[in-house]
């Protein structure tokens, strides 16, 4: 029972940290290397 409580308390924390770091990484990649969808807006 203690293992289940430990799993339920750590899985959301680890998932939040993982998705937060993944989102930050994707934001920084798109900031440094913007995709082609943003080119028409800045070319005018």
UniProtKB/Swiss-Prot annotation:
Pfam families: PSI_PsaJ. It is a single-pass membrane protein. It is found in: Plastid, Chloroplast thylakoid membrane. Its main location: plastid. Gene3D superfamilies: Single helix bin. InterPro entries: PSI_PsaJ, PSI_PsaJ_sf. GO terms for biological process: photosynthesis. The chain crosses the membrane at residues 7-27. Signal peptide: none annotated. SUPFAM superfamilies: Subunit IX of photosystem I reaction centre, PsaJ. One of its GO terms (cellular component) is photosystem I. Keywords: Chloroplast, Membrane, Photosynthesis, Photosystem I, Plastid, Thylakoid, Transmembrane, Transmembrane helix. May help in the organization of the PsaE and PsaF subunits. Belongs to the PsaJ family. This is Photosystem I reaction center subunit IX. It comes from Phalaenopsis aphrodite subsp. formosana (Moth orchid).
């Amino acid at each position: 029972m203690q293992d289940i409580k430990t799993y339920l308390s750590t899985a959301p924390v680890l998932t939040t940290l993982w998705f937060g770091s993944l989102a930050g990484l994707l934001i920084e990649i798109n900031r440094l290397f913007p995709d082609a969808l943003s080119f028409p807006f800045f070319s005018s």
